[in-house]
Amino acid sequence: LIDTLAYNTYINAFNANLVVNESYLDSATVRENVVSLARNIGYVPRSKTAATATIRLGDINVGTTNDSTTKFLKLRAGLVCVGNSENTTYRFSIPDDVTSTRVRDIGGTSFAQFDNPITVHEGTFLSRTYRVDTSKKQRYIIDSPGIDSSTLRVFVSSIADTGLGRNYRMIDNILNIDKNSEIFLAQEVQDEKYEILFGDGFFGRKLENQSVITARYIVTDGETGNGASNFSFQGSFTKSDGTLFTPSDTVNVTTVTNASNGADVEDLSSIKYFAPRLYSAQYRAVTPRDYEAIIQTIFPRTESVAVIGGEELDPPQFGK
């Protein structure tokens, strides 16, 4: 009996020690706990980052030139092309529609031209809708882990709106926000999923009852998508009247830059390092530590940052 009680006391003490460790940012080891503690001081960990490539589309034959010829072609948001890297095929998508530069007549035949390079993101384009019920306490959680939060687009449609509705913009602080601002915030929750948060009527527009929320985003493989090239077209177009258009010829895709800059979700050591520093900086760039934290948020793909103040030079250069 004494051995059993001693063992029970040991187990309870061990569990209590683990619980206490998970209560502090420095000692926590479970990702959900680290993310939750960082959230308390306003830090949102970096999501997965999709590898991006730059491509050009060749001229697209839209048929004989006449009065009914489309004014433009629109490359629809979603899958655009597939590329290969190390014998693996990757899907590349765009989060927003891209409109052709012009439709040009060449010898009685019209061709849609996309003059500007198009940036494509490695991953699968997905969409999720929610209906607002103000009588319930709702949470708008995106079920898919592994999203690139920079590709997240949120639209809110009220009863009076048509189509997807109004495009809300994502923010990371409440500076210059009023009660009419159409904004949302995104925060990581359990299992590397993201939750969308809206305004309360004081900071940001409050959602109306029975509004429809549409979230569109790209789920990516992160770093493994780097290096993909040899793209082949898989996208779809719409004409100026909104109808689907299927090219009669193969759409030529020219690679401008291979896929690069893909990265995995921010790891625990990075969260523990930058969360308190960004909190102390409060988005102000005054001390070297402030710059170190803020630069990482502006350029999230930065591997390392070294900041030296002028006062540390020999001779010192104050104010630099």
Residue spans for each PLM region:
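Signature of Asx- and small-polar-rich beta-strand/turn repeats characteristic
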Residues: 1-320
